[in-house]
Amino acid sequence: MLQKHASCDIINSMINKNLQVSVKMKYIEYGKHCLDTIILLHGGGLSWWNYEDVANALQNDYHIILPILNGHAESDKAFTTIENNAKEIIEYIDAHCGGSVLMIGGLSLGGQILLEILSQRKDICQYAVVESTLVRPSKLTYYMIKPAFGSCYGLIKHKWFSALQFKSLKIKANLFEHYFRDTCAISKKDMIAFLQANSLYSLKESIKECTAKVHIYIGEKENSSIRKSAVDIHNALPKSTLQVLPKLYHGELSINHGNDYAQKIREIISI
């Protein structure tokens, strides 16, 4: 009997291992597959709804793909690294989009993954939109994240605390239920993992070989690290454009002003 149980345990272990390997990133799609493809990568702690207004505005003219980044709500896969997320999206583009797409956009953590994609595959898209993206590593922030979330992670599941966080992020009010639901669904381990990855990301040397036309956007009211990072990205990509958006905070363009973001995409592609 002991031998039988041991054999079953080995088989179950092998099955579970195979299931774990087969888990893939999830994607939300808008528009017809025959149209030019635009991929938009949401910010850390958010999800596909980061770009819901943008997707609704563009879906009649483009095929919009909204990946749910690993470690986030509705994802079945733990967050590992920015580099691994980038690799997985490249593999998806190879398998489903013929190896390249019209445009990729990304906000904050999504912007870092976008820059990593461009570093790993220089010609994967014709256009790129980098919004509110940090590329100046901070070891101090990195080491503060784990103890900070160790003490307050449990509060995230309280609506009053989540509402305070939400208000500080300057996200429009009608997205609160999305935010609260999805923040509660993120594990402590995943939240610490992607926040720490975000705090340490820096540009790869290979980004300079990128052939995409890159457009960089930051809000006028971003913190100094984001503002300096935007200049770093612009300097690494001399043919890129950099625009500071008056009166806007971190990530507000795509989250709160989806129609404006969509219009900028149309203008970029039409040039």
Q: Which sequence ranges carry the predicted segments?
A:
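Catalytic histidine-centered segment of alpha/beta-hydrolase-like enzymes
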Residues: L248-D260
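Gly/Ala-rich beta-loop-alpha elbow adjacent to hydrolase catalytic centers
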Residues: G106-G110, L114
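Short beta-strand/loop motif that positions the catalytic acidic residue
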Residues: C210, I216-I218
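Flexible "cap/lid" loop of the alpha/beta hydrolase fold
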Residues: S119, C125-L155
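Active-site loop/oxyanion-hole signature of alpha/beta-hydrolase fold enzymes
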Residues: I65-G105
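Conserved alpha/beta-hydrolase catalytic His-Asp/Glu region
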Residues: K139-T141, L155-K208
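Acidic catalytic loop of the alpha/beta-hydrolase fold
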Residues: K221-S225, G251
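Conserved HGGG/HGGXW glycine-rich cap/lid loop of the alpha/beta-hydrolase fold
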Residues: I28-E74
